[in-house]
């Protein structure tokens, strides 16, 4: 750029070089919209359910606009729960089934939607480990979920495949302790 500037200057054309810094407001919370009475949701929700196949379905109020929101949500969920990325299916944009939110607006997907997905994923993992503990007659704290398998938390030894856990929880609850409730669909909302 400097060489081009100098060449133009030699011909009597004066151009400079400039630098501009800009900060865009993103992920505004309730105080931003609520005080003005705008009917704009400043929170977002996420629902994740474990299918009997061991795969996860994630419903979120944020939407994909070409900036990778679906992939980001899938990565957050896979990491929070302890499954492979390819085992997470993200569904967006269906207001009949997804938790209430206000979409992406191109700059709030990760900040609000990603946090809702993280909180939901952590809660689902906790519930999955409770089911696994009931199946394995163990304690939830002695187990972990890694790459879609319930493992011994101390040794990493595989104890139960997530698909088998799903099969038992959905189709053989009679083999679980009396009055045990498998909560394998979780919804959480995040308000910044």
Language model regions located:
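Cofactor-centric catalytic regions
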Residues: 1-57, 65-80, 93-192
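Short acidic capping loops at alpha-helix termini that bridge into adjacent secondary structure
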Residues: 84-89, 141
């Amino acid at each position: 750029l400097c060489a081009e500037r100098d060449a133009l200057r030699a011909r009597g054309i004066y151009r400079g070089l400039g630098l501009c810094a800009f900060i865009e407001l993103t992920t505004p919370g309730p105080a931003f919209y609520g005080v003005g009475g705008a009917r704009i949701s400043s929170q977002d929700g996420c629902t994740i359910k474990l299918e009997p196949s061991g795969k996860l379905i994630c419903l979120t109020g944020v939407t994909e606009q070409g900036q990778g929101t679906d992939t980001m949500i899938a990565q957050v969920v896979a990491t929070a729960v302890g499954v492979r990325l390819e085992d997470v299916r993200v569904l967006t944009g269906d207001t009949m089934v997804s938790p209430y939110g206000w979409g992406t607006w191109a700059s709030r997907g990760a900040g609000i939607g990603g946090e809702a997905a993280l909180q939901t994923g952590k809660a689902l993992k906790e519930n999955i480990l409770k089911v696994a503990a009931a199946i394995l007659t163990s304690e939830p704290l002695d187990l972990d979920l890694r790459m879609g398998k319930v493992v011994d938390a101390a040794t990493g030894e595989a104890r139960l495949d997530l698909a088998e856990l799903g099969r038992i929880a959905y189709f053989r609850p009679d083999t679980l302790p009396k009055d045990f409730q498998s909560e394998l669909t979780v919804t959480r909302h995040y308000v910044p």
